[in-house]
Amino acid sequence: MSTTKLDSIKDNALAAFKAAPSSKDLYDLKVQYLGKSGSLTEIMKEMASLPKEEKPLFGKKVNEVKQLLEAAYTEAEDALKKKEISAKMAAEEIDMTLPAFSQPKGTAHPVNIVVEEIFTVMSRLGYSIRTGPMIEKDYYNFEALNIPADHPARDMADTFFVDKTHVLRTHTSPIQIHSLENEELPLRVIGTGPVFRCDSDISHLPNFHQIEALCVDEKISMADLKGTISFFVREFFGPGLKTRFRPSYFPFTEPSAEVDCSCPICKGKGCSLCKQSGWIEIGGCGLVNPKVFQAAKIEYPKWQGFAFGFGVERMAIIKYGIEDIRLFPENDVRFLRQFVK
């Protein structure tokens, strides 16, 4: 009777293991047949009622069935795990036919776009890019540029002083002095970076960006300066634009001039951007003052040079017809999206 019951347990367990739909169901069957209170454990208790001579044979058969069921369980467990992994992978498979999610395009800031375009134009003329410290010594920001402590030109810019001898640079002109002191002549450099002044309104920011170009060679004249700027204006704003030079004053250049170009928006006909004049001021320029060469220990008149500087935000305003300079630092995506390259 016990042998017949043992065979029945074996057959039922093998069939159940094979038919188990999941790993959890299979484990429950293992507990049912092979657990401490399972069917095999219960049938072992019946050995006590068997004759003494039958007990060894019956015990051996129970162990054989147990080993068989354990092997069958392991085989069924492996098969179910593979099946479940395959099902999971199939469920997670990427359907390449599904429509893709559109990603918004990143945009370069208009200031960076303008700087890159200026560098592209000037590099064609042999100019190399330079930068300088934003916290500058008073000497480089003023004195080396022919602006001593008692010079009235210091009133032209309200300055952020870090301490008695250091300032947040008010212009990028100090890059000229660093280049003259540290580089071999002749040289053509263009510097850029943020500058700082105590000023803020519709056309001024306390923190804005400048471009500063310097050319030094043995024979430099005002004609070279005018030709370079005229070429730059046409390449940057577009062909057909005119330039004009008005006498002005800067301590670090002599002679000095303000540079105007015909309005690229209205082509000189008159509009709100150029205030109906047809002309827009874009920056200042001049031949390098001999005192600047003297401060940098450069022999003059053997070496001569010219320099010019533009406000980057102003160049962007003129090129793109932007009405308020205060839009640049706000980082409003509605504004920035208009400049996707």
UniProtKB/Swiss-Prot annotation:
Signal peptide (UniProt feature, chain positions): none
Keywords (A to Z) from UniProt: Aminoacyl-tRNA synthetase, ATP-binding, Cytoplasm, Ligase, Magnesium, Metal-binding, Nucleotide-binding, Protein biosynthesis
Organism of this sequence: Bdellovibrio bacteriovorus (strain ATCC 15356 / DSM 50701 / NCIMB 9529 / HD100)
Subunit structure of this chain's protein: Tetramer of two alpha and two beta subunits.
Any single GO BP term: phenylalanyl-tRNA aminoacylation
Any one GO MF annotation of this record: ATP binding
Protein name in UniProt: Phenylalanine--tRNA ligase alpha subunit
NCBIfam families: pheS
Catalyzed reaction equations: tRNA(Phe) + L-phenylalanine + ATP = L-phenylalanyl-tRNA(Phe) + AMP + diphosphate + H(+)
